[in-house]
């Protein structure tokens, strides 16, 4: 059996990153703990956390608790029986977004299959509270498939996020092994219905590579996402969070990611981020529509003016 050290040595150079723990990052992490908030950036061990928090004014909050009712074999988030919903969470998230001066916030959530509404009402309330308190911050939501509950999806979309993100994660053949509690077709239907409910809101999905898929299967998944009218695609390298999770079957090179991005753009995606360290929320602030970008611009101007007055 390979040792932990051997696994690290097998990783190619392009997956080795230099962590830049600046003052902004350290302060934000302290505030998260003080407010009993969770970010998927930390829980999922995202390699881009220092860039997003420290430089891009982007963060991904994980709501509805820190324990997921599912146990997908690629994911580092804790699984088990969740706690009761925290009804004060929407206000705390909104306050934290304000204190962090975020340009773009991604609000994701653990799957709450234990709840009748899958947590959609608290989720939508979080979006509304963030919007009320931070009118210039763009908001992306990244929900589970809500167990196929499309009333829950309608509740979410009525909160008018700037992007709806729902990840297909892998190709059709591998879906039962990678995320047994979800289905490939339910993900596509969730994305398709999201666009039908709010045609002006961009939809987005993400694929992990390195789980044993073929290039042809990746192209087919791109076609399936475009058929569901998905606008934005991110493609990143799967990295095994622990020995309990699925093993990496292949490390894709930056050149291979470049080729995948080229194919995706040729297939009609409006945006595609593809690279070894790309994750679903990577450079998400750039992917909103023009009206949302104008709000970001106004917010940036107000923030700069406030700094100059200080």
UniProtKB/Swiss-Prot annotation:
GO terms for molecular function: 4 iron, 4 sulfur cluster binding; lipoate synthase activity; metal ion binding. It is found in: Cytoplasm. Its cofactor is [4Fe-4S] cluster. Gene3D superfamilies: Aldolase class I. One of its GO terms (cellular component) is cytoplasm. Residues 285-310 are annotated as: Disordered. Binds 2 [4Fe-4S] clusters per subunit. One cluster is coordinated with 3 cysteines and an exchangeable S-adenosyl-L-methionine. It is an enzyme of class 2 (transferase). Signal peptide: none annotated. It catalyses: [[Fe-S] cluster scaffold protein carrying a second [4Fe-4S](2+) cluster] + N(6)-octanoyl-L-lysyl-[protein] + 2 oxidized [2Fe-2S]-[ferredoxin] + 2 S-adenosyl-L-methionine + 4 H(+) = [[Fe-S] cluster scaffold protein] + N(6)-[(R)-dihydrolipoyl]-L-lysyl-[protein] + 4 Fe(3+) + 2 hydrogen sulfide + 2 5'-deoxyadenosine + 2 L-methionine + 2 reduced [2Fe-2S]-[ferredoxin]. Residues 54-270 form the Radical SAM core domain. Keywords: 4Fe-4S, Cytoplasm, Iron, Iron-sulfur, Metal-binding, S-adenosyl-L-methionine, Transferase. [4Fe-4S] cluster 2 binds at residues 68, 72, 75. It comes from the Bacteria. CDD domains: Radical_SAM. InterPro entries: Aldolase_TIM, Elp3/MiaA/NifB-like_rSAM, LIAS_N, Lipoyl_synth, rSAM. The keyword Transmembrane helix does not apply. It holds the Pfam family LIAS_N. Pathway: Protein modification; protein lipoylation via endogenous pathway; protein N(6)-(lipoyl)lysine from octanoyl-[acyl-carrier-protein]. [4Fe-4S] cluster 1 binds at residues 41, 46, 52, 281. HAMAP family: Lipoyl_synth. Belongs to the radical SAM superfamily. Lipoyl synthase family. PANTHER family: LIPOYL SYNTHASE, LIPOYL SYNTHASE, MITOCHONDRIAL. This is Lipoyl synthase. The lineage of its organism: Bacteria, Bacillati, Bacillota, Bacilli, Bacillales. The gene is lipA.
């Amino acid at each position: 059996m390979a040792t932990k050290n051997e696994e690290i040595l097998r990783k190619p150079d392009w997956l080795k990153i230099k962590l830049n723990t600046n003052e902004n990052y350290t302060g934000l992490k302290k505030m998260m703990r003080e407010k009993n908030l969770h970010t998927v950036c930390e829980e999922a061990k995202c390699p881009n956390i220092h860039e997003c928090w420290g430089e891009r004014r982007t963060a991904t909050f994980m709501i509805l608790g820190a324990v997921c009712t599912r146990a997908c074999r690629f994911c580092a988030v804790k699984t088990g029986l969740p706690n009761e919903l925290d009804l004060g969470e929407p206000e705390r998230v909104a306050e934290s977004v304000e204190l962090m001066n975020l340009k773009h916030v991604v609000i994701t959530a653990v799957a709450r299959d234990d709840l009748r509404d899958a947590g959609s009402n608290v989720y939508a309330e979080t979006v509304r509270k963030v919007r009320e308190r931070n009118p210039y911050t763009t908001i992306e939501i990244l929900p589970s498939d809500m167990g196929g509950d499309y009333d829950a999806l309608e509740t979410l979309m009525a909160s008018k996020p700037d992007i709806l993100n729902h990840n297909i994660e892998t190709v059709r053949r591998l879906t039962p092994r990678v995320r047994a509690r979800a289905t490939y077709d339910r993900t596509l239907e969730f994305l398709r219905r999201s666009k039908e409910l709010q045609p002006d809101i961009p939809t987005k999905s993400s694929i992990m590579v390195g789980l044993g898929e073929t290039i042809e299967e990746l192209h087919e998944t791109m076609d399936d996402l475009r058929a569901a009218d998905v606008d934005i695609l991110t493609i990143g390298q799967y990295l095994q969070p622990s020995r309990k999770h699925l093993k990496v079957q292949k490390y894709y090179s930056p050149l291979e990611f470049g080729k995948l991005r080229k194919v995706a753009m040729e297939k009609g995606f409006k945006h595609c981020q593809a690279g070894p360290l790309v994750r679903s929320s990577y450079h998400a602030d750039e992917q909103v529509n023009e009206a949302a970008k104008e709000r970001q611009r106004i917010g940036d101007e107000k923030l700069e003016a406030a700094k100059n007055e200080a």
